[in-house]
Amino acid sequence: MNNWTEALGEEKQQPYFQHILQQVHQERMNGVTVFPPQKEVFSAFALTEFKDVKVVILGQDPYHGPNQAHGLAFSVKPPVAPPPSLVNMYKELAQDVEGFQIPNHGYLVDWAKQGVLLLNTVLTVRQGQAHSHANFGWEIFTDKVIAQLNQHRENLVFLLWGSHAQKKGQFIDRSRHCVLTAPHPSPLSAYRGFFGCKHFSKTNRYLLSKGIAPINWQLRLEIDY
């Protein structure tokens, strides 16, 4: 199994999945602002092919402010400033990865292109209303994504931050994959153990131990936009 079409093609034909797309389309048609924009809902899959995934970082639902969400968990397009959870991820990276310099943006595409699947468990949201699409059925779809990676790939690293992500990843086979857990990087919980978790260096140590090229976590310091 090499690509997302093979991994998820049948799933996308399921009635529940068609119903999700209909619900989202109906909201947009009714003038409701839904994030991310339609063409970016599946960006995580477009940027990180099934066979290329090395690391999975699970988010929850997309940012619900204007010009933030673009289909990658935790990532924002310039010139939007990095949101608080991402700021804390950068702080941890600076402590954990020698030489890491904090960029002036929150655009994580360079991670995605190296095999970091930045997957939200719900793929759309209404503007200004967190978790507004949580009951649309997206969780069934993203459960399938994780199940296919769990079953058909090996030696992946799953970074599960916060109780929601940890519950979502509870069935991952720990004998085939590396599962790292910590509190969420949100300012509400980062001090409970996200800071100091060293997940970024641990990820690379695991990949190297399996003969897999590590992730270069350093992002470009500035992005022209």
Curated annotation (Swiss-Prot):
One BP annotation, GO: base-excision repair, AP site formation via deaminated base removal
Keyword flag DNA damage: yes
One GO cellular component term noted in the UniProt record for this chain: cytoplasm
HAMAP family from the UniProt entry: UDG (MF_00148)
Role of this protein: Excises uracil residues from the DNA which can arise as a result of misincorporation of dUMP residues by DNA polymerase or due to deamination of cytosine.
InterPro entries from the UniProt entry: UDG_fam1 (IPR002043), Ura-DNA_Glyclase_AS (IPR018085), Uracil-DNA_glycosylase-like (IPR005122), Uracil-DNA_glycosylase-like_sf (IPR036895)
Assigned protein family: Belongs to the uracil-DNA glycosylase (UDG) superfamily. UNG family.
Keywords: Cytoplasm, DNA damage, DNA repair, Hydrolase
Pfam family, one: UDG
EC number per UniProt: 3.2.2.27
Name of the protein described by the UniProt record: Uracil-DNA glycosylase
Catalytic activity reported: Hydrolyzes single-stranded DNA or mismatched double-stranded DNA and polynucleotides, releasing free uracil
Entry's localization field: Cytoplasm
MF-aspect GO terms: uracil DNA N-glycosylase activity
Residues annotated as transmembrane: none
Catalytic residue list: 61 (proton acceptor)
